[in-house]
Every structure is written in C-alpha cells, then in structure tokens.
Amino acid sequence: MDINVVNALAYEDFVKLFGNVVEKCPLISAAIWSYRPFKDLADIEARISEFIHSLPDSGKEGILRCHPDLAGRDLQSGTLTPESQEEQSQAGMTTLDSAEIVHMYRLNSEYKERFGFPFVICARLNNKADIVRQLSERLKNRRTAELECAIEEVKKICSLRLHSIVLSDIQTKL
C-alpha cells in the first residue's frame, strides 16, 4: 500500500485499518490521523511513539493493561484479537502443555501483582522459551524500568503490525 493511499483514507477508514496496531487502543490511531499527510511508514511510527511518550505513566499503564496475558484466559477461551492470536500462535504459546500453561499462569499472576499491568513482549520476535525466560528476568526489574521496557515492547508490536498492514492489500482490511 502506498503512503498516498494511507493519507487519502477517511478518518473512519484510517481508524478501522490502524485501530489495533496498539492492542485495543484505537484512540491512538484516531489521534495521529490529524498529522496527515504522513511522509512514510516511519513517520506514522514516530507519531505513534510521540503520542505514547507524551502520556503520563497512568496512560502508559492503561495501554499495557489492554494487552492480554500470554497463554492466558483470552487465548484459552478464543477471545484474543486476531492480531494477538496470530502473534501468540507464532511464538508457540498455543502449543503449551498443561504444565507449561500452569507455569505461565503463575508467572503472569506474579508479574501483574508486582507491576499492576500484564507482561508485554513482542511475541513475533520471540519463542515460548524466550518469553518464559524474559518474564522471569523482568520480574526482577524496578517498576519504572519495567514500565519503559514494556512500552518499548508495545512499540515493537506496533511496528510489526503497521508493516503487516501496509504490506497487505488494503481492500481486505476495510
């Protein structure tokens, strides 16, 4: 998809197309639409990043709370967004055995209790062993460091989702 096509999208179509590049946060796409025309995909990413970084910590935490637990209840019940379903599947989270599911549940619960938001990692850039290792390691972080780390992971997820949309056929998304 050409950037000119993106720039020509009506507000409603833009939000529909890009509304889940940050999990369950269409407000971000709605806000950056005002910055059109975008120079390129990197410009869209920069605007999203600027928007996220302009938020107070409570806003950043809100973004993180929109993310599902990895291998959690939403995956088990089939209620993930299509993007999250695909990402967790690619990372091997859909093939965990019952002991691994229990272990992930325990780690996810410990993480949420410690930080107040779910563990976020770019699943498409990791496999299940990496995810478990990172989750265990990041439990040792200070809260402020972990908030920044998790937001950086959100930006990686966003970047990959943006690229997937732009490289796909726009007509199938609208």
Swiss-Prot record:
Protein family membership: Belongs to the OHCU decarboxylase family.
InterPro entries referenced in this protein's UniProt entry, alphabetically: OHCU_decarboxylase, OHCU_decarboxylase-1, OHCU_decarboxylase_sf
Biological role stated in the UniProt entry: Catalyzes the stereoselective decarboxylation of 2-oxo-4-hydroxy-4-carboxy-5-ureidoimidazoline (OHCU) to (S)-allantoin.
GO cellular component annotations of the record: peroxisome
EC number: 4.1.1.97
Assembly: Homodimer.
Keywords (A to Z) from UniProt: Decarboxylase, Lyase, Peroxisome, Purine metabolism
Catalysed reaction equations from the record: 5-hydroxy-2-oxo-4-ureido-2,5-dihydro-1H-imidazole-5-carboxylate + H(+) = (S)-allantoin + CO2
Compartments where found: Peroxisome
Catalytic residues of the enzyme: 67
SUPFAM superfamilies cross-referenced by the UniProt entry: UraD-Like
Cystines in this chain: none
Pathway assigned to this chain's UniProt record: Purine metabolism; urate degradation; (S)-allantoin from urate: step 3/3
Enzyme class: lyase
GO biological process, one term: purine nucleobase metabolic process
Effect of residue 161 to Q: Loss of activity
Principal localisation: other
Alphabetized GO MF terms: 2-oxo-4-hydroxy-4-carboxy-5-ureidoimidazoline decarboxylase activity
Motif (Microbody targeting signal): 172-174
Name by which UniProt lists this protein: 2-oxo-4-hydroxy-4-carboxy-5-ureidoimidazoline decarboxylase
